[in-house]
Amino acid sequence: MNRHFGWIATLIVLGILLLLVMVQIDRQWQRMASMQNVMTEQARDLRALRRSLQGLESDLASGRFAGMDAGRAPRVDEVPSAFRRAAEAAGTEDYAEGDWLVQAFGTGLATITPYVSSDAYASEVQNYVLESLVQRDPQSLEWQGLLAESWEFDDSGTELTFRLRPGLQFSDGEPLTAEDVQFTFDFLMVDAIAVPRARAFLEKVEVVEALDERTVRFIFEEPYFDAMRVAGGLGVLPKHFYERYLDEPENFNESRGILLGSGPYRLEDPTGWTPDAGRIELERNPRYWGPVEPSFDRLVWRVIQNDSARLTTFRNRDIDVYGARPREYARLRDDEALRERADTHEYMSPTAGYSYIAWNQRRGSEPTRFADPRVRKAMSHLTDVDRLIEEVMLGYAERAISPFSPRSDQHNPDLEPIPYNVERALELLAEAGYEEKNRDGVLVNEEGEPFSFELVYFQDNEDTRRIALFLRDLYARAGVEMKPTPTEWSVMLENLSRQDFDAITLGWTSGVEVDIYQMFHSSQTVSGGDNFIHYENPEIDAVIEAARGEVDEAERMEHWREAERILHEDQPYTFLMRRQTLAFIDRRIQNLEQTALGLNLGFVPLEVYVPFEQQRHGQ
């Protein structure tokens, strides 16, 4: 009996001790949670203090004083409209500055020097460093001021005057004034500066005048429908930094990484980036003039050209975004490990660009077989785009009929896609002098030369490789020999500049309203121009010019639809498809949203962030 009582007493004591231990552990967890909250608040306070000190440093340097509340997040109603979405994000409960946004490019970049570079990858980087006078609201698509606080046209519609915000400065602390805007235009119009695309973009501008420190006027040759985009969208270069290259233009033209601006991020060394770095890294601009601080400490792009290596890097959490190809995406959507840490984003951007095959009509001084529109149209009839979309893209794309989106008012609804029709293609080729003469299935011309050409494509794009191989077999059935030619990105760009290729497959980005002057007007066949296929048609030249000079939107759309009809008949490109974006994005990236301009991941001012508790990287 006593022995049983002793065991019972022992168990009671042990139970009481266990209860006390559990209570103590619970208190310790509460203390740890409290300490974590305190540390989080302290980190936020430190970031606010840093923001205040940086603002004070900038204000003292520029002769301004921000006041005692410089460190607090601004209210939405206190900031210019271009910063309101960023201010809304900064006002959310879990918002925090800090961490890095790490992405990957599937190709190396030849240069990130502004206006010398010609690809979307360099433009993505420059977007965080250079700023323009205005930009579009992501939802309404209306223009809103960035560097400019106001603007107005004169009664003639040929003069557009901007008033700059006070206190603007570049990342090196030098003030940004109207003189820098004028310099940017003047610099780009110097013939020795090798920027033919920029000059074509600015062709309608006669002169830019700095009227005073904060007022700049663009004078156009005639009223121009796209005047706001041309003048307001010009990335402003600092005169004090770039003017040296007027005396040594070859150093600018051949440069790899001369990049300095007024944006929220900067290169640590604005002249020191080189392609062999294997990555591009931008740091927060401590002198940024904007009312909302950029959220990330650093933006990093790693160059990872192999798809498998890029996916492995994403799985290892070393990059935050993985753009998947259709076959991968279909497989990875059901990958439990990925679904736990990443969100899927599958969408067709309203301004999605298009892919195409461009048929070069002149090499050197000699016309090619593709100078004959019957040959080009035959090649479009031999290109089964619908099968490409289903078998290569797995349905994650839509047909492109022209440079204009089918949802755009520029599109002519009477036009139908060029159908896959081998019989019609052979008829057109026979009219152009290509027939089977040796009973070997190969088409030859009157001199007995086989219809054979090379199709250049980017070697590291698996989807494009599949498309090229698919088309090789398809064309061969009709007696046309196409040789797929995988090529490095830098070599492709050089081929374009020299216009040295038979055919090439690439893509163009798009916009709210697409001006096709640079791609299809005959004046743009110059070396380095975007009409790198030597397409020349006086009829479309006249229609493009009429559209560009028409400020009445309804009338202008009629001109664009006529231009589309001519392109549809001429087929300077075989228009392929508009692809959906298929992406996995690390779930710690917050405030992602679809807008009228697409996903807001790359918007500037920045709208996305990582809550403090989920941050991985220090400064």
Model region roles, listed by residue range:
Residues 86-87, 99-155, 186, 260-262:
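N-terminal lobe/hinge region of extracytoplasmic solute-binding protein
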Residues 253-254, 282, 286-332, 472-473, ...:
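Ligand-site clamp/hinge motif
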Residues 208, 268-281, 302-366, 386, ...:
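Extracellular/periplasmic solute-recognition and catalytic clefts
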Residues 15-18, 58-85, 284, 347-348, ...:
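Detector for C-terminal structural segments
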Residues 28, 35, 42, 103, ...:
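Ligand/substrate-recognition segments at binding pockets and active sites
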Residues 94, 163, 198-246:
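Surface-exposed binding/hinge segments that line
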Residues 38-48, 149-194, 217, 310-315, ...:
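Aromatic- and charge-enriched surface segment that lines or borders ligand/interaction sites
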Residues 120, 124, 134-142, 234-294, ...:
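Gly/Pro-rich hinge or "lid" segments in bacterial periplasmic/extracellular proteins
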